[in-house]
């Protein structure tokens, strides 16, 4: 019998993934990662629901204490990024360093199981010519999460199942109801998991980063107002600047050395190119010559045409056909060719 470890968060997606595989005849083991430190986090609603689902399905349930791994790879990663004026993307980092990698290691070393599954909306293919596993967009483009999975390795893709990749969210809820799952009507999480535990991103950052007042200036250096810490701002931000001006102003740069927030008009917040580091080439080998494809520089943005220029050392330059608004250092630039995710990396300052 095929054995698989399913990551269970206690939500409808992971619950349905586990139930679907169990229904298909897989020998399923549920695994929940204990991520948050602090009072009450050991018995969070998600962990309780995950345990209930496993009991309902009649499958084993393991809880792995990942709090130190989460703090090092996500909390520290976020704080250090915001301190130097970038806006980190924790979800892709979490998927590789906290979830998929450690989950597969636990499955292999502790349970003797060589396959894992999650409730992510994405698909995995295999190219016979290149001999590489490919990461593909989900059928439900509105729920597609491949953008956050660009950092997965070939080993992880070879060992992973995405049972929900070929269905819509509505179908997932319908299937959950058919299985009688407690989580069938559970609302979706609207924020990062760590933000839900702290109230808001601002509250979270203020807990770790000391507020330091500085100037809000225009592109010529004229002081327009004051801020209480550059970690409260991100490139392209318009709301909450607290600066009066005859035309809308946007954050165009964060200067951690001078502790300044630099603002300008919308055109000033546009870029024709950017550098990307820590590239992980997923579905194709690392190219040695320029290629033309599409790039997505924010989760909810549309892919746009780019020229990709390899720089070596896992770095590339993206040259856009048209200037792009609000390209944000620390966020991911992910390359696609149709539904195929070619690779991705982190936008540099």
From Swiss-Prot:
GO terms for cellular component: cytoplasm. ATP binds at residues 7-14, 33, 119. It catalyses: S-sulfanyl-L-cysteinyl-[protein] + uridine(34) in tRNA + AH2 + ATP = 2-thiouridine(34) in tRNA + L-cysteinyl-[protein] + A + AMP + diphosphate + H(+). It is an enzyme of class 2 (transferase). Its EC number is 2.8.1.13. It is found in: Cytoplasm. Keywords: ATP-binding, Cytoplasm, Disulfide bond, Nucleotide-binding, RNA-binding, Transferase, tRNA processing, tRNA-binding. It comes from the Bacteria. It holds the Pfam family tRNA_Me_trans. Disulfide bonds join 94-193. GO terms for molecular function: ATP binding; tRNA binding; tRNA-uridine 2-sulfurtransferase activity. The record marks 120, 331 as: Interaction with tRNA. GO terms for biological process: tRNA wobble position uridine thiolation. Catalyzes the 2-thiolation of uridine at the wobble position (U34) of tRNA, leading to the formation of s(2)U34. Belongs to the MnmA/TRMU family. This is tRNA-specific 2-thiouridylase MnmA. It comes from Gloeothece citriformis (strain PCC 7424) (Cyanothece sp. (strain PCC 7424)). The gene is mnmA.
């Amino acid at each position: 019998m095929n054995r698989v470890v399913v990551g269970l968060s206690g939500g409808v997606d992971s619950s349905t993934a586990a139930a679907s595989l169990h229904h298909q005849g897989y020998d399923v083991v549920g695994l929940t990662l204990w991520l948050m430190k602090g009072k009450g986090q050991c018995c969070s609603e998600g962990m309780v629901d995950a345990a209930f689902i496993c009991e309902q399905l009649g499958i084993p349930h393991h809880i792995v204490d990942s709090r130190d791994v989460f703090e090092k790879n996500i909390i520290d990663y976020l704080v250090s990024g915001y301190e130097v004026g970038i806006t980190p993307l924790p979800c892709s980092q979490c998927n590789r360093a906290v979830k998929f990698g450690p989950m597969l290691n636990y499955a292999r070393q502790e349970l003797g199981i060589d396959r894992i599954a999650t409730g992510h909306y994405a698909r995995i293919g295999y190219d016979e010519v290149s001999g590489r596993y490919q990461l593909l967009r989900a059928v439900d483009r509105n729920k597609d999460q491949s953008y956050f999975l660009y950092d997965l390795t070939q080993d992880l893709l070879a060992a992973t199942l995405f049972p929900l990749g070929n269905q819509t969210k509505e179908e997932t809820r319908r299937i959950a109801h058919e299985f009688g799952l407690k989580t069938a009507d559970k609302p979706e999480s609207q924020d990062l998991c760590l933000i839900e535990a702290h109230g808001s991103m601002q509250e979270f950052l203020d807990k770790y980063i000391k507020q330091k007042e500085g100037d809000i200036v225009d592109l010529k250096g004229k002081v327009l107002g004051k801020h209480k810490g550059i970690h409260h701002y991100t490139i392209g931000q318009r709301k909450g600047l607290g600066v009066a001006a005859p035309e809308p102003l946007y954050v165009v740069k964060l200067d951690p050395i001078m502790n300044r927030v630099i603002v300008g008009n919308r055109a000033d917040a546009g870029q024709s190119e950017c550098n990307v580091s820590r590239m992980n080439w997923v579905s194709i080998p690392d190219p040695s010559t320029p290629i033309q494809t599409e790039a997505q520089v924010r989760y909810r943005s549309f892919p746009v045409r780019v020229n990709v220029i390899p720089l070596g050392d896992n770095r590339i330059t993206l040259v856009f056909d048209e200037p792009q608004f609000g390209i944000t250092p620390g966020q991911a630039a992910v390359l696609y060719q149709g539904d195929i995710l070619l690779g991705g990396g982190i936008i540099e300052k």
